Amino acid sequence: MMEVGGLFDAEDCFGAWNVYKAIEKQSPATSNRLVIGPWFHGQWAGADGTHLGNVRFGSNTSLWFQQNREIPFFNYYLKGKGNLDSIPKATVFFTGENEWHEFKIWPPQDVQLTNLYLQANNQLGFTQPASGNNPDEYVSDPAKPVPYTSGIHEDRTREYMTDDQRFTANRTDVLVYKTDTLKEDITIAGPITADLQVSISTTDADFVVKLIDVFPDDFAYEEDANTQKPGYIMNGYQMLVRGDVMRGRYRNNFEKPEAFIPGQISKVKFTMNDVAHKFKKGHRIMVQIQSSWFPLVDRNPQKMVDIYTCSDSDFQKATIKIYHDPDHASFLVMPVLHE
């Protein structure tokens, strides 16, 4: 069996990763392979896989997959040719460096779970926050939701999963945290966990967390000699690496929704889909937090009512506070790969 998926599969970014993991856990004797490329849904079969939106991947990743993984796999099972041992257990493309990596298992065994903390003054770092930090806050208004893309589209776009996030960074209902300029590469391999300490003024809210790669101010793509595609400037581009959402009422149990107590600090913890990305030296890591992502995610009335039957009058503003002090630290658990 071979599970094939895309890092930027807007239809099902969850499936391929987790089918592979489930088979490894529940049926370890099954011959099982995983291939993840920098693709949207089905891009490995229907497009060249050189780019998605403005972000380039350096080569025809779809053709590489077909020649080096798909054909050998079907030659073995359909024609009895070749050796299945030539196909690694996990083959994953890492954006940022634009390289394929081979692993004996996914997530790799040599990752170290590392906390990336929200800190004062919109800072992000690997050290615990200092004492005395006041929470950051914003007002989430369902009548003015944060859009998922800067353009106006009839259909949901594929490109939003690598879109430039600068269009939301200056909104007052989006919190932005970023590291200093990285002095060395940081490679992430596996699922990310968002662990937030929050309070809200109402009884429900959504929490959208976005992990972003901030390109240097002088970054530009050169002309591609293979494809003849012209170069272009990417100065300060804020590439969405992974984004996910937790509807707050389900923070403790998906079967038993639970209202928030207004003003009371609560933990909102959830697992985001797997990431395979290298944050390069000279870049920055950014985290954005918001409470709407419209129309990708339906609007939350921010009130503990049945969302499917509620009325317009149920939709209300909510003041959201995100805490980042030693007793109420908020952070992302990052699977850092040591190569």
What are the residue ranges of the model-derived segments?
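Conserved alpha/beta-hydrolase "acid-adjacent" motif
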Residues: 10-17
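Catalytic histidine neighborhood in serine/cysteine hydrolases
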Residues: 24-51
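C-terminal, loop-rich substrate-recognition/catalytic regions characterized by aromatic stacking residues
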Residues: 44, 49-339
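Acidic beta-to-alpha connecting loop that harbors the catalytic carboxylate
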Residues: 7-9, 292
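Alpha-helical scaffolding segments of alpha/beta enzyme cores, especially the outer helices
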Residues: 18-21, 72
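Short beta-strand/loop motif that positions the catalytic acidic residue
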Residues: 3-5
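Glycine-rich beta-alpha junction loops
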Residues: 7, 39-40, 120-122
